[in-house]
Amino acid sequence: MEPIGRCVCVCAVRIKSGEVDPMAAVIFALLCVFPPVVPRPASVTSDPSPRLPDVIIIGVRKGGTRALLEMLKLHSQVMAAQSEVHFFDWDSHYQRGADWYASQMPSARPGQLTVEKTPAYFSSRRVPERIRQTTPEAKLLLIVREPTERLLSDYTQVFHNRLEKHKPQQTLETLLMRDGELNLDYKALNRSLYHEHLRHWLSVFPRSRMHLVDGDALIRDPLPEMKKVEEFLQLEPQINADNFYFNQTKGFHCLRQRGRERCLHASKGRKHPNVAPEILNKLYEYFREPNQKFFQLAGQTFDWK
């Protein structure tokens, strides 16, 4: 209110001094008290609101998507959906339309990025085209890890989920092996054939729209991978070494932000089942050629067995 008070005072002084016509001074004073409303820039006046995502973490399942999302949330310009939305891969959700999808996103201001993750997107044939039609400008993040390790992690999650629901269990060997050979119908095996899924995505989106994160490197040393993600998303550099610390008890890196420390859910980092060496060797051999095809499509290599 101070600027208004000073303006009225100037008007009154001018009236007394006779510098201006009294009526003009009164009008001037009224303008000072009730100045014209000048619209503010949208970045100031716009309230936070949900909108379609700017970034989608499309997979892979058990590749480190939750860790990637939590690390992205360290950045002040990132607003992330907390749950997996499954908009593009579940018909029951997709039929609700783009407005419903936007309503599942967190509120964000102009200049902030909205992010969602649904790992099942990567291996779903229908998803790429649906994303292109709904949010064609979205950037895509794909985090991958060594295929055999991903398969073992996939099995471990399903095993514990069934255990919690008191459902019958099957050993990995029962699911993975058939008559002494790999069961090529095992879903967890197919999810690790990254080249097949990536080829379909690249038939819809240019490679430049997608950034590949090395999930194994992210576990060992998060910062270098996160700096690459910041650069791809054109975020100002914020994430730094102080945001991470190694938890000796859990055996992986946890997060630190504004003095608060937090680790991923206890379900992360579960011990994998013991697997016979001959089965592991079969898996490594089976994935060798598909991995090379994936490297060629991706235009980058990974340090896998």
Task: Tell me the role of every PLM-derived stretch.
Residues 126-129, 133, 137-142, 149-243:
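PAPS-dependent sulfotransferase catalytic domain
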Residues 47-49, 175-183, 267-278:
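Short glycine/proline-rich turn/loop motifs
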Residues 54-55, 60-61, 66-69, 73, ...:
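A generic "structured core" feature
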Residues 64-65, 101, 115, 131, ...:
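Generic structural signal for small/hydrophobic residues in well-ordered secondary structure
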Residues 1-7, 12-122, 134-138, 147-171:
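PAPS-dependent sulfotransferase catalytic core
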Residues 95-98, 124-125, 195, 277:
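Structural motif corresponding to alpha-helix initiation and N-cap regions
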Residues 199-285, 289-292, 303-305:
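The conserved 3'-phosphoadenosine-5'-phosphosulfate
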Residues 98-105, 128, 198-199, 291:
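Generic structural signal for well-ordered alpha-helices
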